[in-house]
Design a protein with these regions (language model features):
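Non-DNA-binding regulatory cores of transcription-related proteins
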Residues: 96-99, 109-130
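Domain-level recognition of soluble alpha/beta enzyme cores
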Residues: 122-153
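Generic beta-sheet signal
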Residues: 4, 98-107
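Short alpha-helix plus adjacent loop in nuclease-associated cores
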Residues: 83-93
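Hydrophobic packing residues within well-ordered alpha-helices of enzyme cores
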Residues: 62-66, 89, 115-116
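Functional cleft and adjacent loop/helix regions within the main domain
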Residues: 76, 82-83, 144-162
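Active-site-proximal alpha-helix that buttresses catalytic centers in soluble enzyme cores
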Residues: 3, 7-84, 127
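Glycine-rich phosphate-binding loop signature in dinucleotide/nucleotide-binding domains
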Residues: 44-46, 96-101
Length: 162
């Protein structure tokens, strides 16, 4: 079985308009929701094999909350995840090392919402910031993941934990 945790970055700040989109940090809500969601996930699991994270400032900052509480065997910050389409994200997933059975992806919308809608049997209008979706795939190779072998195990949004 393969397992993916799809997480949209926490809420980012628009205060400093001189910063480009890639460089925007988390705002105060993001700095609250990130730790809250990482605590939630750490009560369910203690390890994920691979963290694949966009290298933008807000995704990097979000990832740190999860790294503090969950063990990752390998971590990769990847600029190609910044505003990737769902098909680009799926292509990345299908190339994950087969030694990994679980992976967390921290990236951006609309790519993540579209990804969830394409590889699972649920339909989301919008994955909110710090929204988490856990999907199991009944297969042994990342290249075999599809909507036909997926099961959504958990969906959690910050507002559900407040």
């Amino acid at each position: 079985m393969k397992k993916i945790y799809v997480l949209r970055h926490s809420k980012s700040s628009w205060i400093d308009l001189s910063l480009g989109d890639f460089h925007r940090p988390l705002n105060s809500r993001g700095q609250t929701d990130g730790p809250m969601m990482s605590v939630y996930l750490s009560t369910r699991i203690d390890m994920i094999d691979f963290l694949h994270c966009s290298s933008s400032v807000r995704t990097y900052e979000t990832s740190k909350y999860f790294i503090e509480r969950i063990k990752f065997i390998d971590i990769q910050y990847d600029e190609s995840l910044y505003h990737s389409s769902s098909s680009e994200i799926i292509n990345n997933i299908k190339c994950y090392d087969e030694q990994y059975n679980s992976a967390m992806i921290i990236a951006h919308n609309p790519g993540l919402t579209n990804l969830i809608n394409e590889i699972s049997d649920i339909s989301l209008d919008n994955l909110p910031t710090t929204g988490l979706v856990e999907i199991n795939f009944d297969c042994t190779k990342w290249s075999d993941i599809s909507i036909d072998n997926s099961t959504v195990v958990d969906i959690k949004f910050p507002k559900q934990l407040k």
